[in-house]
Amino acid sequence: MIDPNLGYQIATVSLVLFALLGAFDGIYFHMIKYRLYEHPPAQFEHQLHTFRGLLFLPIALIFFVWNSAGMILWFGLLLLLVDFVAEIIDILVEKEARSELGGISPIESVIHVTATGFRMVAIALILALKPIEAFFITSYTCDFL
């Protein structure tokens, strides 16, 4: 069994690395280099990125800031599912959306894969460290209240 403090530290570092890579990808590649918001074929992709960016705050709060359980934890899992579906849709539309721009560069692909890996490590650790009772719908733990 992993030491919970070490697990939370690794999860936090992974989340921070994900956020830094995501911010770099969004600001540099999407807004500065490719200006996706100005490219009509990439409008939907840009909207997906914006939507996923908005999902980040409640997901981060529910899983990494608050000690959530019960309904709040399940709501967080629902948000993760919605984010995952949006990510899959993004992957499916990205190639065509960027075809006129030359597609996605290898370095941007590396950033996407690496950031996703950090996010998955963070989420997996946080969920693995939760006691089974936290997943009971009748559980109530949330440190922010």
Where in the sequence are the language-model features?
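Hydrophobic transmembrane alpha-helical segments in integral membrane proteins
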Residues: 1-21
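Membrane-interface segments at the starts/ends of alpha-helical transmembrane spans
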Residues: 1-6, 107, 140-145
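Membrane-interface helix-loop junction between the first two transmembrane segments
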Residues: 23-44
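Membrane-helix exit/interface motif
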Residues: 28, 55-69, 87-97
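Juxtamembrane helix-capping/reentrant segments at transmembrane boundaries
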Residues: 37-50, 101-110
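Hydrophobic/aromatic-rich structural module bridging two neighboring secondary-structure elements via a short loop
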Residues: 40-47, 62-84
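Core segments of transmembrane alpha-helices
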Residues: 49-63, 113-124
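Membrane-proximal helix-loop-helix units in multi-pass membrane proteins
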Residues: 70-142
